[in-house]
UniProtKB/Swiss-Prot annotation:
Belongs to the bacterial ribosomal protein bL28 family. GO terms for biological process: translation. It comes from the Bacteria. The keyword Ribosomal protein applies. GO terms for molecular function: structural constituent of ribosome. The lineage of its organism: Bacteria, Pseudomonadati, Thermodesulfobacteriota, Desulfovibrionia, Desulfovibrionales. One of its GO terms (cellular component) is ribosome. HAMAP family: Ribosomal_bL28 (MF_00373). Keywords: Ribonucleoprotein, Ribosomal protein. This is Large ribosomal subunit protein bL28. The gene is rpmB.
């Protein structure tokens, strides 16, 4: 799916590098994406690529890891 958040759809934006002499060249601002395991409401666990804003806001439910006794 490329560099795009699977929850909010955030993707790269275009901007400029600006030098001291004010010469502008194109650059890309990439979102901070992380691959995390997400537990779906059905109980299934799936790996998704999400931005850190969605992680912090609680939009992704991490699966419960059980310790073996």
């Amino acid at each position: 799916m490329g560099k795009q958040c699977e929850v909010c759809g955030k993707k790269p934006q275009v901007g400029h590098h600006v030098s001291h002499s004010n010469i502008k060249t194109k650059r890309r601002f990439e979102p901070n994406l992380q691959s995390v395991r997400h537990q779906l409401p059905s109980g299934e666990v799936k790996t998704v690529t999400v931005c850190t804003r969605c992680l912090r806001s609680g939009a992704v439910t991490k699966p419960v890891v059980r310790k073996s006794a």
